[in-house]
């Protein structure tokens, strides 16, 4: 197992870091850590060390419910030793921290509530400017099960088998100038985004795809990667079975 060098400063360089890897045809993995579900600093240190050592490319920090600013800062601080980016995955404007390397600046494109499409972003923008957090413009699109994120975000979820609609959203995001499209099946979803949807989208758009939700095995992750997913996100499996998460990361990084 290769231990990677620590303490490379990434503030202001996260988008370049990610794009350089993608341009080298790497497939990436993000580890989603929910501060609300972390029971102790010892647990977080153990999980983070193992995920880092097998090659996860970034830590995403965030959750839909129960995350305070203090807990967010605490988790980011504990991850500070690792050279990979610490990226905020915000559910609302309370999840902003100057300690992070970057922020996914999300717009929930298929929400029926304008607040989640552009309202929260307007409120957050001056704060982000003041805190000098690097932003990564990302279209967030919820598919299938959707979970808590769909409920809170009032999303009109895209059916798992409606490839044309998912492609239309992806193209809209590309034309709006987004850097990424994040297709989300929802935390703990009974099934992930279908590989057929990803390959269908990739025939029409070259925008990098982040895929998350319902990914519980290396076999599923590899099918998504083979279909064209650029970045795989796992969260629940990290909390439930870190050894399975490690296998997923190894599979993706050895692809």
From Swiss-Prot:
CDD domains registered for this protein in UniProt: PcrB_like (cd02812)
> Pfam families recorded for this chain?
PcrB (PF01884)
The entry's localization annotation reads:
Cytoplasm
Q: What is its main location?
A: cytoplasm
Q: Which residues bind Mg(2+)?
A: 34, 64
Query: Which reaction is this enzyme known to catalyze?
Result: sn-glycerol 1-phosphate + (2E,6E,10E)-geranylgeranyl diphosphate = sn-3-O-(geranylgeranyl)glycerol 1-phosphate + diphosphate
* Cofactor(s) essential for the protein: Mg(2+)
Identify the EC number(s).
2.5.1.41
Q: Which GO terms describe its biological process?
A: glycerophospholipid biosynthetic process
Q: Where does sn-glycerol 1-phosphate bind?
A: 182-188, 213-214, 235-236
Pathway(s) the chain acts in:
Membrane lipid metabolism; glycerophospholipid metabolism
Q: Which domain of life is it from?
A: Archaea
Key words, A-Z: Cytoplasm, Lipid biosynthesis, Lipid metabolism, Magnesium, Metal-binding, Phospholipid biosynthesis, Phospholipid metabolism, Transferase
GO cellular component annotations, sorted alphabetically?
Answer: cytoplasm
> What SUPFAM superfamilies does the record point to?
FMN-linked oxidoreductases
Report the NCBIfam families cross-referenced here. GGGP, GGGP-family, PRK04169.1-2, PRK04169.1-6
Instruction: Describe the family membership recorded for this protein in Swiss-Prot or TrEMBL.
Output: Belongs to the GGGP/HepGP synthase family. Group II subfamily.
Function per UniProt = Prenyltransferase that catalyzes the transfer of the geranylgeranyl moiety of geranylgeranyl diphosphate (GGPP) to the C3 hydroxyl of sn-glycerol-1-phosphate (G1P). This reaction is the first ether-bond-formation step in the biosynthesis of archaeal membrane lipids.
State the name under which the record lists this protein: Geranylgeranylglyceryl phosphate synthase
